[in-house]
Amino acid sequence: MTSTNGPLRVGIGGPVGSGKTALMEQLCKRFRDRYEICAITNDIYTKEDARILTVAGALPEERILGVETGGCPHTAIREDASINLAAVAEMSRRFPKLDLVLIESGGDNLAATFSPELADITLYVIDVAGGEKIPRKGGPGITRSDLLIVNKTDLAPLVGADLSVMESDTQRMRGTRPYVFASLREGTGADAVARFVEEAGGLGR
């Protein structure tokens, strides 16, 4: 359902390699038959993530737009989001009945956040391979995102990470804010993320 303010805009952030593109792919495949959806990816000097989504068949090519941010990727989603706002406007022009735009940030540090002008809902992805201590390091993405995804749980035995410790730290850092433990390459946890986006974003109402 497209609101009078345009499509629901969901920002997906997280460090390099945490699984943002995998989450984009999983959400696109779950939503594409039910909603009018587009995807916008941010890379510093390439459009690699857009290419990955296209090759994976997540959406038709014309519904995926790659943005080259240059410089610091967090600037393009917060301090000066104009390039991404223009991308959202372009997709809305192409598809007037657009319900949902997924916006993947370029990989950045734990302090990166989306401007509320750009994203209605923010999802933040961290991964177990980054170390058991990641949740307790905090940062706006971990503590204030609308939903935190702790990805690559399947790698915990290989990197010596205790998932129960990570969950305890996640609960402590986030308070009542929701989180999901996931293995997005296999699709584990993706349904829970999709449900959250639908419920929090009022899709289908």
UniProtKB/Swiss-Prot annotation:
Coiled-coil ranges from the UniProt annotation: none
Major subcellular site: cytoplasm
Pfam families the record matches: cobW
SUPFAM superfamilies (UniProt xref): P-loop containing nucleoside triphosphate hydrolases
One BP term from GO: urea catabolic process
GO molecular function per UniProt: GTP binding; GTPase activity; nickel cation binding
Subcellular localization, as worded in the UniProt entry: Cytoplasm
Keywords: Chaperone, Cytoplasm, GTP-binding, Nickel insertion, Nucleotide-binding
Alphabetized InterPro entries for the sequence: CobW/HypB/UreG_nucleotide-bd, P-loop_NTPase, UreG
Domain of life, source organism: Bacteria
Binding positions (GTP): G14, P15, V16, G17, S18, G19, K20, T21
Any GO CC annotation of this UniProt entry: cytoplasm
Assembly and oligomerization: Homodimer. UreD, UreF and UreG form a complex that acts as a GTP-hydrolysis-dependent molecular chaperone, activating the urease apoprotein by helping to assemble the nickel containing metallocenter of UreC. The UreE protein probably delivers the nickel.
Family (UniProt): Belongs to the SIMIBI class G3E GTPase family. UreG subfamily.
Record's function text: Facilitates the functional incorporation of the urease nickel metallocenter. This process requires GTP hydrolysis, probably effectuated by UreG.
Alphabetical list of PANTHER family matching this protein: UREASE ACCESSORY PROTEIN G
Protein name: Urease accessory protein UreG 1
